[in-house]
Amino acid sequence: MRRAEENNGFGTIPKRRNQHTPFYASIGMIVVIIVAFTSYHITSYGDDRNRAMRQYSFTFSLAYLAFLVGELLRRCCLFAEEYRHIETRYNGSLKKAIQTTFSFGHNNVLFVASLLFFVVFVASNDPNGSSSVIQGNSTAEPHTEMRQTSGWQGLWGQFIISALLTPLVVHLLGLRELSKVEESQLNEKENKNVADGLAWSYYFGYLKFVLPELEKQIEKTSKFRSKEKFVKKMFILIPSNCFWDDKIPGSDYDPQNRITFEGNTEPLEKTRGGVFLRHYKHSVYEIKDGENEPWFCIMEYATPLLTLYDMSVAQPGELSREERDAQVVVFLRKLQDILEGDRACQGKYELVTFSPDRDLADVMLRKLKDSELEIGG
């Protein structure tokens, strides 16, 4: 099956990334170290090997410390900007401003590694070591000194250490991670948290209290209490383009008019947001299969997705179409994680993804039959 055809034409829903990058970086670092030191071990002899070890240690320590100082200087620039907003953003707390600006991942490892590399740097730059590293050993033979300071083998080894090993170690220590300040700036600038916020709002503002009561509302409605082929779940419709007509029967998603509105359940009454006994009811639909046998279910669109659609067509547009497509996947994944984490909601819903060019009746019939098999219907 082509990826574009998966999930009823909705497309592939990517899995969450696993945190395997540090493992791959560790393997890469080990390989680089082995290659660098093996290459010089093969091409050098006697005291040259000791000088090579000091030279490589000195080169790497210097490169790492240079990067660390540069990163700290960059964070100082960020702090200078945050200090201008210390009253409005941090309630005048200098400590909070410093913590958000100078926060690093893997703090303990960073401290130990920095201390270690500083010791190596000093040791490599001692009178005996530095002279052999930078100036060459005065007692070495001329051809040995030349090979040590300007030979291709030495230059190649230093290149491997500086260009390959340092970035891997920097990544492992979390120095490339964004600070909390930068994450906040990115979210404010590019609306990166839109889908997550919509999913949480949908859950706390609606699904959290209607899903646990769904079956009770069906049982209270005499018209639907004894219906056969009634899968007692809420089927939440998620079209890939985030758009739909207000009515399901006869819409573009129901070209053959196979979906029929049968009525509403008895309402759930809940005082909320200052509205006394607000009513929450659900619409029940009938869908006929190829044998003209009726199936019944509760369907409704994930209404927060209309916000993503409106943002993608607004002028000036806050989201491009590509960003909207990415956000709907984030919404789907986040909503599924939230609902699966709530035991009261488990087994009471189905997320139905589909492409606008699919017949919703066919999509729903497959879902209904699969759900009936799952519950042993």
Swiss-Prot record:
UniProt: 3',3'-c-di-GMP binding residues: Y206, R272, R278, E300, Y301, A302, T303
Where is this chain's protein located in or outside the cell?
Endoplasmic reticulum membrane
Please give the residue ranges for the topological domain Extracellular. Answer: 43-57, 123-154
Q: Which InterPro entries match?
A: STING, STING_C_chordates, STING_C_sf, STING_LBD, STING_TM
Question: Which UniProt keywords are present, listed alphabetically?
Answer: Autophagy, Endoplasmic reticulum, Membrane, Nucleotide-binding, Transmembrane, Transmembrane helix
Ranges per topology, Cytoplasmic: 1-21, 81-101, 176-377
A Pfam family hit: STING_LBD
Per the record, its GO cellular-component terms are: autophagosome; endoplasmic reticulum membrane
On the tree of life, the source organism's domain of life is: Eukaryota
Q: Where are the transmembrane segments?
A: 22-42, 58-80, 102-122, 155-175
Q: How does it sit in the membrane?
A: Multi-pass membrane protein
Q: What is its main location?
A: endoplasmic reticulum
List residues binding 2',3'-cGAMP: Y206, R272, R278, H279, T303
An example of a GO molecular function for this protein is:
2',3'-cyclic GMP-AMP binding
Per the UniProt entry, what are the Gene Ontology biological process annotations, in alphabetical order? activation of innate immune response; autophagosome assembly; innate immune response; positive regulation of macroautophagy; positive regulation of type I interferon production; reticulophagy
User: How does the annotation summarize its subunit structure?
Assistant: Homodimer.
Query: What PANTHER family does this protein map onto?
Result: STIMULATOR OF INTERFERON GENES PROTEIN (PTHR34339:SF1)
**What is the similarity comment for this entry?**
Belongs to the TMEM173 family.
Its job: Sensor of cytosolic DNA from bacteria and viruses that promotes autophagy. Acts by recognizing and binding cyclic GMP-AMP (cGAMP), a messenger produced by CGAS in response to DNA in the cytosol. Following cGAMP-binding, promotes the formation of autophagosomes, leading to target cytosolic DNA for degradation by the lysosome. Exhibits guanine base-specific ligand recognition. Binds 3'-3'linked cGAMP, 2'-3' linked cGAMP and 3'-3' linked c-di-GMP with much greater affinity as compared to 3'-3' linked c-di-AMP.
Protein name (Swiss-Prot/TrEMBL):
Stimulator of interferon genes protein
The source organism is Nematostella vectensis (Starlet sea anemone)
